[in-house]
């Protein structure tokens, strides 16, 4: 009986230490709470935009009388469009209008370009802050020929295609660089009784800045 009483007293004395050790083990066995992961916000290209561009063109005007004339030029204008986005695919429509200062003479025949514009489809791939894209559509330009005796100006319609890279500079400001090839086909001009056939091809590099709504 005395032994049993001693055992009860010893067990009661050790009980707080056992509870403390068990609590410590329970605390240590809890898995650590992972730190929250910060996810960068995904930029959306969807919506409307407008902007300005400045470019330089390498042109080739083939004529039936004096051969090829190369009226390289500076050009400037404005663009506007609307994008739709599905996952990482961005697609939409864009138009531009501007002025080309292309003008050059050869053997008495002058070729001069003026207003130019286009209406195109665009498709790009969203890389979050940058978007490479392809574009193609119809183009138009005012092209004038002058042989010193007479001149004639015609609005020419052709096609254009190109590629570019657009980048997000701020939440609403976009920057871009674009290459475009445009062909206006063949057209006859009547200059003082002489028929001059002309074909104009242009290659442009354009840089632009835009505002996304």
Swiss-Prot record:
Highest rank taxon of the organism: Bacteria
Transmembrane keyword on record: yes
A Pfam family matched in the record: OMP_b-brl
Cleaved signal peptide residues: 1-23
Localization annotation: Cell outer membrane
Keywords: Cell outer membrane, Membrane, Signal, Transmembrane, Transmembrane beta strand
GO cellular component term, pick one: cell outer membrane
Keyword Transmembrane: yes
PANTHER family: BLL7405 PROTEIN
Family listed: Belongs to the Omp25/RopB family.
Protein name (database record): 25 kDa outer-membrane immunogenic protein
Native species: Brucella neotomae
């Amino acid at each position: 009986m005395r032994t049993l009483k001693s055992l009860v007293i010893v067990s009661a004395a050790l009980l707080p230490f056992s509870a403390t050790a068990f609590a410590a083990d329970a605390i240590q066995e809890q898995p650590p709470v992972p730190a929250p992961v910060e996810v960068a916000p995904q930029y959306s290209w969807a919506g409307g935009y407008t902007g300005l561009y400045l470019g330089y063109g390498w042109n080739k005007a083939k004529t039936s009388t004096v051969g090829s004339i190369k009226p390289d030029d500076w050009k400037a204008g404005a663009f506007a469009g609307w994008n739709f986005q599905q996952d990482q695919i961005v697609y939409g429509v864009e138009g531009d209008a501007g002025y080309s200062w292309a003008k050059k003479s050869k053997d008495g025949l002058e070729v001069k370009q003026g207003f130019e514009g286009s209406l195109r489809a665009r498709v790009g791939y969203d890389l979050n802050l940058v978007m490479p894209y392809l574009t193609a559509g119809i183009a138009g330009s005012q092209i004038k020929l002058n042989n010193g005796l007479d001149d004639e100006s015609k609005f020419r319609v052709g096609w254009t295609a190109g590629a570019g890279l657009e980048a997000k500079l701020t939440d609403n400001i976009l920057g871009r660089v674009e290459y475009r090839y445009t062909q206006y086909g063949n057209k006859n001009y009547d200059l003082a009784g002489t028929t001059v056939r002309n074909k104009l091809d242009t290659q442009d590099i354009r840089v632009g800045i835009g505002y996304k709504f």
